[in-house]
């Protein structure tokens, strides 16, 4: 019997800032406007540097996670969406393990969302303190207590802004969710930048452009040996190359292809004779949720490992969790796990690394597939998309499955939904691993998130278009 945890935190949820639900139907044009405003605020916060930081030039321990967590180093968006996703991860695991009870009522759902927001704010403060005290912005002793507190307040306010922007879209004022919007924007921005960046970097081969496409034309124009120039443009190390770009496009195409896989269950109206329809169960039943939660798990493990490494360097247990080394070739300095649990849960750094340490590869594949399948399976129980919830929705709409009674509908849906959730999560994990091994820009997880989010927005657009009757009616 789980404890009634939601009732305990109810008084705290009442004092949290909240976006009110719209009192009227929001038109598509208004939704586009609110979505654009939300995105603009996020992008502005990504460019405003934190006041009071002494230095952010040290190796970045979260370089590999920033694209996925929509964060930008040394700015108000330092934490990105990490606190929201982490609070969602914790609440989901607690509900999935039946440690807390979440009923089917709207009241319980609202309390669950309130608890998630409360945890998000607590995690924001916790992460801000960890970032400051581990010396990411300079030695705390040199900065002084006042400046340290000021940085923590800035990060907390920025985290609160992200929470409210996400809630604004989720309540129906905009399209999709803030988390999805910020992730997709960050990943697409990274891909475009890595492809067309005009920034020059001094390497052992001379001065080169960071952007893969610009580097191709630059190498062909400046090198006398054109074949060697082409080889460099396609396979150069530590900088974006054309093979990375091709891999990115390939993964985009594969994920879009798999988005169309689904099983249509025949349903009919219990009220009107001859009214038939179908209920689609997609292969990616839980969409990108498994990969977002898996990223949150890994990023928090990185935070803990980095924090302990700074404070207790050389300790056996700390090294068992993760050993870190600085990498500076071809871009900003960043920390990368070279040992311990964090190393085995991170993707191989290059194709060569796959053959150098096959144990790392095997552990990484098992972790990705297992965690994505697990998160996908548990997510349906707390998100209102389990077989029992779907059967209840169909019953409310007075729809029944053809050839089945009301009582057997849950049993029939149970044959498909949990399997689709687990197998879909497994496929998401497998595609992410494939993208990592192919060297796709923005990491396999990032590409997968970008494609699934863009596809979600495409589906929203098509649905809105069908409701208002044509493209012209959407905007005019």
Curated annotation (Swiss-Prot):
Domain of life where this protein originates: Eukaryota
GO CC annotation: Sec61 translocon complex
Subcellular location per the Swiss-Prot or TrEMBL entry: Endoplasmic reticulum membrane
Major subcellular site: endoplasmic reticulum
Cysteine disulfide links: none
Keyword Nucleotide-binding carried by entry: no
Keywords: Endoplasmic reticulum, Membrane, Protein transport, Translocation, Transmembrane, Transmembrane helix, Transport
Record bears the keyword NAD: no
Cytoplasmic domain ranges by topology: 1-33, 97-117, 166-172, 262-288, 376-420, 463-476
GO molecular-function terms, A-Z: protein transmembrane transporter activity; ribosome binding; signal sequence binding
Annotated membrane topology: Multi-pass membrane protein
A GO BP annotation: post-translational protein targeting to membrane, translocation
Lumenal topological intervals: 54-76, 139-144, 194-240, 310-354, 442-445
Membrane-spanning segments: 34-53, 77-96, 118-138, 145-165, 173-193, 241-261, 289-309, 355-375, 421-441, 446-462
NCBIfam families: 3a0501s007, PRK08568.1-5
Annotated function: Component of SEC61 channel-forming translocon complex that mediates transport of signal peptide-containing precursor polypeptides across the endoplasmic reticulum (ER). Forms a ribosome receptor and a gated pore in the ER membrane, both functions required for cotranslational translocation of nascent polypeptides.
Binding partners and assembly: The SEC61 channel-forming translocon complex consists of channel-forming core components SEC61A1, SEC61B and SEC61G and different auxiliary components such as SEC62 and SEC63.
Family membership: Belongs to the SecY/SEC61-alpha family.
Name of protein: Protein transport protein Sec61 subunit alpha isoform 2
């Amino acid at each position: 019997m789980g404890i009634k945890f939601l009732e305990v935190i109810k008084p705290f949820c009442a004092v949290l800032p909240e976006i009110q639900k719209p009192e009227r139907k929001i038109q598509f044009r208004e939704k586009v406007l609110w979505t654009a405003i939300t995105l603009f605020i996020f992008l502005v916060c990504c460019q405003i540097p934190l006041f009071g930081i002494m230095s952010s030039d040290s190796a970045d321990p979260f370089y590999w996670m920033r694209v996925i967590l929509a964060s930008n180093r040394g700015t108000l968006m330092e934490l990105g969406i990490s606190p929201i996703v982490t609070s969602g991860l914790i609440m989901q695991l607690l509900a999935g393990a039946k440690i807390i009870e979440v009923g089917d009522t709207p009241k319980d759902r609202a309390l669950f969302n309130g608890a998630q927001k409360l945890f998000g704010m607590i995690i924001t403060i916790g992460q801000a303190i960890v970032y400051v005290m581990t010396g990411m912005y300079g030695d705390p002793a040199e900065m002084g207590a006042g400046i340290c507190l000021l940085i923590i307040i800035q990060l907390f306010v920025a985290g609160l802004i992200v929470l409210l922007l996400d809630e604004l879209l989720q309540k129906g004022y905009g399209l999709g969710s803030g988390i999805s919007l910020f992730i997709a924007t960050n990943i697409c921005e990274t891909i475009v930048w890595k492809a067309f960046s005009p920034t020059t970097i001094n390497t052992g081969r001379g001065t080169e452009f960071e952007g893969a496409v610009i580097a191709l034309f630059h190498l062909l124009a400046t090198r006398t040996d054109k074949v060697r120039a082409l080889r460099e443009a396609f396979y150069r190390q530590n900088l974006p190359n054309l093979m990375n770009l091709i891999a990115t496009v390939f993964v985009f195409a594969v994920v879009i292809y798999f988005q169309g896989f689904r099983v249509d269950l025949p349903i009919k109206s219990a009220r009107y004779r001859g009214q038939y329809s179908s209920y689609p169960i997609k292969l990616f039943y839980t969409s990108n949720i498994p990969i977002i939660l898996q990223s949150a798990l890994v990023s928090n493990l990185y935070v803990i490992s980095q924090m302990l490494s700074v404070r207790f360097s050389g300790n056996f247990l700390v090294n068992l969790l993760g050993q870190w080394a600085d990498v500076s070739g071809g871009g900003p300095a960043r920390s990368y796990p070279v040992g311990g649990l964090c190393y085995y849960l991170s993707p191989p750094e290059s194709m060569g690394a796959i053959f150098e340490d096959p144990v790392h590869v095997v552990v990484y594949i098992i972790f990705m597939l297992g965690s994505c399948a697990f998160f996908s399976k548990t997510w349906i129980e707390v998100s209102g998309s389990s077989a029992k919830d779907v059967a209840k929705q169909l019953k409310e709409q007075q729809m029944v499955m053809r050839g089945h009674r009301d009582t057997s509908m849950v049993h029939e849906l149970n044959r498909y939904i949990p399997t689709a959730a687990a197998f879909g999560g497994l496929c998401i994990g497998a595609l992410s691993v494939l993208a990592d091994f192919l060297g796709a820009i923005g990491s396999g997880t990032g590409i997968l998130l970008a494609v699934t989010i863009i596809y979600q927005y495409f589906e929203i657009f098509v649905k809105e278009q069908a409701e208002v009757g044509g493209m012209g009616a959407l905007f005019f």
